[in-house]
Amino acid sequence: MKNINFNNTQSYQDLKNHFRKIKNIHLRDLFASDLNRFKKFSIIFENEMLIDFSKNRITDETLIYLLNLAKETDVKSGIKLMFSGAKINKTENRSVLHIALRNRTNRPIILNNCNIMLEVNALLEKMKNFSKMVIHGEWKGYTGKSISNVVNIGIGGSDLGPYMVTEALRPYKNHLNMYYVSNIDGTHLTEVLKKINPENTIFLIASKTFTTDETITNAHSAKKWFLHYSQDQSALDKHFFALSANIKNALNFGININNIFKFWDWVGGRFSLWSSAGLSIMLSIGFDNFEKFLDGAHAMDNHFYHTNYKENIPILLALISIWYTNFFGSETEAIFPYDQYMHRFSAYFQQSNMESNGKSINRNGQRINYQTGPIIWGEPGTNGQHAFYQLIHQGTRLIPCDFIAPVFSHNDLNNHHMKLISNFFAQTQALAFGQSRDSILHRLILSKKNQDDIKRILPFKICKGNQPTNSILIRKITPYNLGALIALYEHKIFVQGYILNIFSFDQWGVELGKELSQNIYNYLNINVKNKSYDASTEGLINFYKSFMI
């Protein structure tokens, strides 16, 4: 890996100089001066997905400098290292091989002198057989009833990803009721337990380490609830399953060895939905659809690995993101899926991006003096239009946005979808081109308002535009297309981290909070005043404990 701070490259200097020249150019002018702009700045993926990046504040020259940056930092070598199984997660001495989980060609991937595809395929076969038994009613609970409810207990990547996908692919859902429990707040589990019957429910305990406090706490409470009804320890074998890399801890919990679906330390938690952590997805949509989901991701993997810099979708989107965060000074990026089934898509990539690239130390162990990962947020359209779009249109911040929509809806109720898509097109147009003073003035005059009213209202109606967007149009949200879309964003995150010279696959910041919370939890059980914390934490703890007397 090239451990170069990107602001020490010639490409960075070129971009810095170039930025001074174009920073005030409006998108209106960029489109007016180039009638081929859309054609040049858009890519179609497999005739299923259109990526339009023409409404970005870039020129041909910008793109040349950005692509030079990718070449100078040698992104292609980084891609090859990841796909080969090199230990690019240096701080944990691990490979990063979620791509192996969707390697549909079965190309051998050698790790520690072993072809890991043999284990991957064996796991997939085990998941297939189990899911078919559950879906077809052949797997029975402790009283002989078929399974109707599936409860996935996990947090972070073991929850956000599977939950997002099962929601996005709800049109492909079978009869099983899917529930997801993540929060250590007892309310989350309690409300799910109210809805289910222990006789026809299975619990999937999804934790790579099988030590995550939230997950294991919820799992123990679910187990206690189940045993209260079954009164039979052996009944756990019909109802509790572990999705984990830690076989020993799963066995100690009471999981039958045959009920453990393993995954490996080379699968990062936030990329684990492709692994056994995605068992709930397979149970929801069936094995055949899960295979198509993997196929779509594999197709994007091939595009990412083989396509040149200039036409490589994840590379281009990553470069454009870096352009905004490090030159325009934008702090956030928004993701707006115009599809209600995809209502958790933004939240999933909030975690994937911010946990991956929320770093301030470079790969040489030195503090960074440039911006790394942006804040990711978003909601489905059109809800967001009536919540926070106002700030994007007329606020003081630059907020690059991704708009995602299907051409065909799964629920084309009357003309609902055409209205939805009309909003999609209108918002990207309005954000790019805005509404100038002259055009508003002309319309106000035509409306025959008096001069005083025009003068009073005119400044407030101006929308400056020049807000950048990417538009991703997908033929339909299918398992294949969703798989490709997720892989696209995953690879974008990798490229961003690689160029920014950070390690994208650890999360040491998360670990600190875990350690401190355990210390405080132990202390809360002691009925003495705290003397070892800062004044604020001590005050909070003492106020809490005053109610426990």
Curated annotation (Swiss-Prot):
Q: Which family does it belong to?
A: Belongs to the GPI family.
| Coiled-coil features, chain-numbered ranges | none
According to its UniProt entry, this protein's organism is Buchnera aphidicola subsp. Acyrthosiphon pisum (strain APS)
Q: What class of enzyme is it?
A: isomerase
Per the record, the domain of life is Bacteria
What are the catalytic residues?
A: E355 (proton donor), H386, K514
| E.C. code | 5.3.1.9
Q: Name one GO cellular component term.
A: cytosol
Q: What are the alphabetically sorted keywords of the record?
A: Cytoplasm, Gluconeogenesis, Glycolysis, Isomerase
The Swiss-Prot or TrEMBL record annotates one GO molecular function as: carbohydrate derivative binding
Pathway, per Swiss-Prot/TrEMBL? Carbohydrate biosynthesis; gluconeogenesis; Carbohydrate degradation; glycolysis; D-glyceraldehyde 3-phosphate and glycerone phosphate from D-glucose: step 2/4
Q: Please give the InterPro entries that the UniProt record associates with this protein.
A: G6P_Isomerase, G6P_Isomerase_C, Phosphoglucose_isomerase_CS, SIS_dom_sf, SIS_PGI_1, SIS_PGI_2
Subcellular location field: Cytoplasm
The record's HAMAP family line, in alphabetical order, gives: G6P_isomerase (MF_00473)
* UniProt-listed Pfam families: PGI
Q: Per its record, how is this protein called by name?
A: Glucose-6-phosphate isomerase
Presence of keyword Zinc: no
Q: Which cysteines are joined by disulfide bonds?
A: none
User: Which SUPFAM superfamilies does the record cross-reference, listed alphabetically?
Assistant: SIS domain
Any one Gene Ontology BP term: gluconeogenesis
Function recorded in the entry:
Catalyzes the reversible isomerization of glucose-6-phosphate to fructose-6-phosphate.
Q: Which reaction does it catalyse?
A: alpha-D-glucose 6-phosphate = beta-D-fructose 6-phosphate
